[in-house]
Amino acid sequence: MESLEKVEDYIIRWLNDYADKSNMKGFVVGISGGIDSALTSTLCAMTGKALLCLEMPIKQVENQLIRSSKHIKWLEAKFRNVRSIRLNLDSVFDSFCSVLPESKYRDAHELSLANTRARLRMSSLYYFAALNKYLVVGTGNKVEDFGVGFYTKYGDGGVDLSPIADISKTQVFK
């Protein structure tokens, strides 16, 4: 197995090459507070290119945002190319829900709303990417997103590139 440093260097070079060939200035990553978004955003920051970290809470209590906020503060302290925005999407989500018809299928309704949250976040990531000439970077790992398929189509799966797509969850934790 390749050393973690070699994998890290390869991904950083790949991100830089991808951005350069795409004529893009940097990256935008949605920060959830989980290990995958922490690793992905750190790798993007290590490229030296501009990185925008977006926190996009939807119906979340403040203590659910602590890990994402701490990680972003750490990134901003360590890397000068990092900036962040917290974009509260509660009102957008509420507005969308207010025009939906009643559903008698409670489980399907809840799953649909969970996927809607992911799609609102994806739209927000692409808004900021277009404004800044950035690439939207996915945080999916090999097992969850690209093995099991645990993602929302046209939501958190709707990205320009996925730098940790070949890394297992075990490797992510290392």
Summary of predicted features, one role per range:
Residues 1-152, 161, 165:
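ATP-dependent adenylation/nucleotidyltransferase module used to activate substrates
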Residues 157:
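Residues forming the flavin
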Residues 168-174:
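Metal-dependent de-N-acetylase/amidase catalytic core
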